[in-house]
Amino acid sequence: MSSRDYMNTSVQEPPLDYSFKSVQMVQDLVTEEPRTGLRPVRHSKSGKSLTQSLWLNNNVLNDLKDFNQVVSQLLQHPENLAWIDLSFNDLTTIDPVLTTFFNLSVLYLHGNGIHRLGEVNKLAVLPRLRSLTLHGNPIEEEKGYRQYVLCNLPRITTFDFSGVTRADRSTAEVWKRMGIKPKKVRAKQDVL
């Protein structure tokens, strides 16, 4: 199968789905059996999955140590990985390993513990990234969260499952020109 044929077929392939498996470490994926869906994931002669989507959501991952190596063991063409779902884990940073997947177009990181808005800047090197989720992380509480993300990732067309509008783009552009930085929202203290 040529690389071009692979690209055309694997986009329509179901994801390699390790969601809801209580996975604690990325290395555990090598021995863990993926979930099965209505359509099974096809495999190459070497036994690797022919898909461009990897779902690791609803687990207990707190880092992505050895992510590249494990993905290379699981997927026939890891360089073509286009969709990674890491939502509802225990991640506190955006691991730079994610920026090595240049064909990544969908990245779900919602429902984690990412607390520094600057982490988003790491994703600017991904030329095909179009859909990103970050809601449900502590960074969502910062004023200007949406504008900051859109300012730093101008190619995004869907953010937090919501389409990016012209008004969103315009506001983000103003923020960029003015050099506005988001501010942490302080919790109100009850006065006795």
Swiss-Prot record:
Its main location: cytoplasm. Widely expressed in adult and embryonic tissues. Expressed in the developing choroid plexus from 12.5 dpc and in the epithelium of the developing airway tract from 14.5 dpc. Also expressed in the postnatal inner ear. Residues 137-175 form the LRRCT domain. It holds the Pfam family LRR_9. One of its GO terms (cellular component) is cytoplasm. Signal peptide: none annotated. LRR repeats lie at residues 49-71, 80-101, 103-124. InterPro entries: Leu-rich_rpt (IPR001611), LRR_dom_sf (IPR032675). Keywords: Cytoplasm, Leucine-rich repeat, Repeat. Coiled coil: none annotated. PROSITE patterns: LRR. Gene3D superfamilies: Ribonuclease Inhibitor (3.80.10.10). It is found in: Cytoplasm. This is Leucine-rich repeat-containing protein 51. The gene is Lrrc51.
